[in-house]
């Protein structure tokens, strides 16, 4: 008998009892109710031991932008095991079950926030998103910003925020497509201040969510669509100099704020954030928006030890800018083409790392001409994930 069972709302109390223990937090009655409402969109599986939940995994149906195209993904969350059942392979089996479900439901990609990067690498996930953390002395932002327009504090306006966010998110690979429920449940926290910047034609160019407490200006979300909008928001932050001594914010890894300010020597750290995994390699390759090249022909050898049906040799070919993928259903023998694991394939196709970088580190290998071809085929776009689950 399969010990993995899909759980229902009747199991919510036991589900969140395990979550609170495993992740060491305590929910009030109101917070528990909110968690249960959020869980209504989840598919939750439990590894059952005599009708009790020994381990569990949540899967959230989401979609993201990759090179301007929308991809359905499965977000893995709240993976937990009671201590007396740990190290029995329950999480491994739950992950395998979730990957099979995702493939059957057209979710060709999966995200998760790891408690341990090495643990999830064993099952095919790879770091695909970094965060750059800034701690900026307020004094560093007090300069003439040369802006046109204004910033206005605002109450919640999901329609406006969503319009701005969507245009911003499409500039990156892997950013979430948010629906109204996600905005309400996951983004718009109670007590957060909000402001929108407008150009001199009264067109919205960005927004900021923030808190000011204990002499610190904490940016919760910082979104802009133009250089003018960026500067308007920076000037808005600087105008809080009587209330805060420093500013904390998280930005994309390629953020260029240090080039804009007179004194760029402030604390900047880059930290690995979310991991990703291609669930269905042949399907993902077939729908991935490669760059259009006049003529291309190459072989891609993929190894996936956890989902063996992904392993094989794929022919990437194209004429007149149309790229096609053929699954040759062969093993990984032969030296021609490029050889990689599913982890590094995910890293490359999301744009987190370039093929040339990985080849230099011997994380992928192949003949020089093939590496050069795949380098040209994969669009260059920064990865960024502003959400959490």
Predicted regions and their residues:
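Conserved acetyl-CoA pyrophosphate-binding loop and the N-cap/start of the following alpha-helix
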Residues: 85-97, 228-232
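Short loop/turn motifs at secondary-structure junctions and domain boundaries
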Residues: 35-41, 186-190, 347-349
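Amide-forming acyltransferase catalytic core, primarily the GNAT-like/NAT-type
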Residues: 131-220, 224-240, 282-294, 298
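Conserved active-site tyrosine of GNAT-family acetyltransferases
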Residues: 120, 125
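Short amphipathic alpha-helix that is part of the acyltransferase structural core
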Residues: 1-61, 68-75, 141-180, 213-217
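Conserved GNAT acetyl-CoA-binding A-motif
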Residues: 95, 100-114, 242-252
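Active-site/acyl-donor-binding loops of N-acyltransferases
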Residues: 126-143, 221-228, 235-337, 342-344, ...
């Amino acid at each position: 008998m399969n010990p993995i069972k899909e759980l229902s709302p009747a199991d919510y109390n036991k589900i969140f009892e395990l979550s609170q223990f495993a992740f060491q937090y305590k929910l009030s009655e109101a917070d528990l109710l909110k968690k249960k409402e959020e869980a209504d969109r989840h598919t939750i599986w439990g590894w059952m031991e005599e009708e009790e939940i020994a381990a569990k995994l949540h899967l959230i149906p989401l979609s993201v932008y990759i090179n301007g195209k929308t991809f359905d993904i499965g977000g893995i969350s709240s993976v937990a095991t009671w201590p007396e059942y740990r190290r029995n392979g329950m999480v491994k089996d739950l992950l395998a079950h979730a990957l099979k479900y995702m493939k059957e439901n057209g979710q060709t990609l999966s995200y998760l926030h790891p408690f341990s990067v090495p643990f999830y690498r064993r099952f095919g996930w790879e770091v695909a998103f970094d965060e750059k953390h800034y701690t900026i002395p307020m004094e560093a932002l007090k300069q003439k910003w040369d802006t046109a327009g204004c910033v206005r504090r605002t109450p919640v306006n999901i329609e406006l925020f969503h319009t701005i966010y969507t245009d911003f998110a499409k500039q990156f690979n892997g950013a979430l497509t948010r629906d109204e429920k996600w905005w309400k449940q996951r983004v718009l926290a109670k007590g957060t201040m909000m402001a929108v910047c407008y150009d001199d034609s009264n067109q919205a160019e960005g927004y900021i969510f923030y808190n000011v407490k204990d002499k610190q200006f904490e940016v919760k979300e910082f979104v802009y669509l133009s250089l003018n909008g960026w500067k308007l928001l920076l000037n808005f932050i600087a105008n809080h100099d009587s209330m805060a001594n420093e500013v904390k914010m998280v930005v994309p890894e390629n953020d260029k704020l240090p080039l804009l300010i007179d004194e760029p020597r402030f604390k900047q750290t880059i930290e690995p954030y979310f991991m990703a995994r291609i669930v269905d390699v042949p399907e993902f390759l077939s729908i991935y928006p490669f760059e259009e090249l006049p003529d291309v022909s190459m072989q891609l050898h993929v190894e996936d030890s956890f989902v063996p049906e992904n392993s094989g040799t794929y022919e990437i070919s194209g004429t007149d800018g149309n790229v096609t993928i053929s699954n040759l259903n062969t093993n990984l023998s032969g030296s021609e083409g490029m050889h990689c694991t599913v982890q590094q394939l995910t890293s490359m196709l999301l744009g987190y790392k370039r093929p040339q970088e990985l080849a230099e580190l011997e994380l992928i290998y192949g003949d020089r001409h093939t590496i050069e071809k795949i380098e040209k085929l994969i669009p260059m776009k920064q990865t960024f994930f502003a959400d959490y689950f």
